[in-house]
Amino acid sequence: MKIWAKLITDGKIQKQFVYEKQERLTYSRFFDYLSDICHELDIPTPVLLKTHIFNFAKFNHVKFISRDFVESLDYDQLFLENIIL
């Protein structure tokens, strides 16, 4: 499983990271993946809602905007994309 994480400001990628695990993607562990990604990018972890998981499952990507974060975020959005091999 690979997830491409991008921090975007004004439509431009400011920072990116590819999160890799040998295990299969399981949606019950999605918050763990999100926490690991945010720790690696040195940003706060956003609030994860059911709609975020549904969007990731249906469209293979999810976008977290500044209102999804409790703490302030220096970027416009965190965009996670499932890399399908």
PLM ranges: what are they?
Residues 13-40:
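Short, flexible N-terminal segments of the mature chain
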Residues 33-85:
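Acidic, low-complexity intrinsically disordered segments
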